[in-house]
C-alpha cells in the first residue's frame, strides 16, 4: 500500500461492503485507489467500476490497479452521475457502492492545485481540471453577497461578512491571484482573538470556496437521490464524509429512503409513491479507531454511514 496515502476507514468499508467474489462494485471517488485495490483483490469473476472527476487520479490509480486486469474499469466522471455512468456501461444493478467525499490527500499535497492555505499557489481548487469555474473566478468575480453566503453556508464561518467585504475591497485594487494572497486578505478581516485560535484562520473560508468551485454539496445530494436505485437487494452503500454539511445530506438521504410512505395514516390508499428502499446498517456513524487516528490524523473527522438496499 502507498505509504503516502492511507485510505480512511479501510477495514470498516471492506467489512461493511460484504464483498462477493463475483459481485459488481463501484468506487465513486477513486482517488489514489486504496479502497479500490482492496475491493478488487477480493474479486475473482466480479467487476470494480472506479470513478473520479480528477484525471490525475485516474492515471495514478490506473497504474496501481493494473494487476487486476479487466476486473477493473476506470471512468473519468463525477460521482454525482454514478447511476448514469452505470447505465452507459450497460450495468443494471451493483452489489455495493463506496463514496469517500471531499478533497483527497493528494489534491491537498499537490501545491500547484491551490487547495492548501499553507503553501503559495495559483487560486484554482478544481477537482476536475477540465471544468471551467476555478477559485480565482469565485474570489475575483462573485458578488459580495454570494461570497458572504458561501462563507456562512459552506464554511460555517462566523466572520463571513467581514471576510467577504475584505475580499471585495482587495480585488478592487488588483485581482487576488494566489492562495497566500487570499490568506493575507482573510487574516486582515479577522479580529485578533480569532487569529489566536488553534484553527488556521483561513480554513473555513478555503473550505467554502472549494465546495463552491466543485459544487460538492449538490453532488452529494444528487448521488444520494439516484445512486442507491442501482443497488441490488442486499447491496450496500458506504459513504464517508468529513464535515457536518456532507454528513447531514447523507444521513437525510438514507432516512428519506428508510421511511417509505409519507401519507397520513387515515389515507385509504398511498398517493405519495414513496416506498422504503434502504435500511441503516448502523444507527450511528462509524468513526475511526484510536489506532487509525495515530497512523492517519487526517481521518479524525471522518464518519462512515452504511445502508443496505431492501
For each feature predicted by the language model, list its residue ranges.
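S-adenosyl-L-methionine-dependent methyltransferase catalytic core, i.e., the SAM/SAH-binding region
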Residues: 1-310
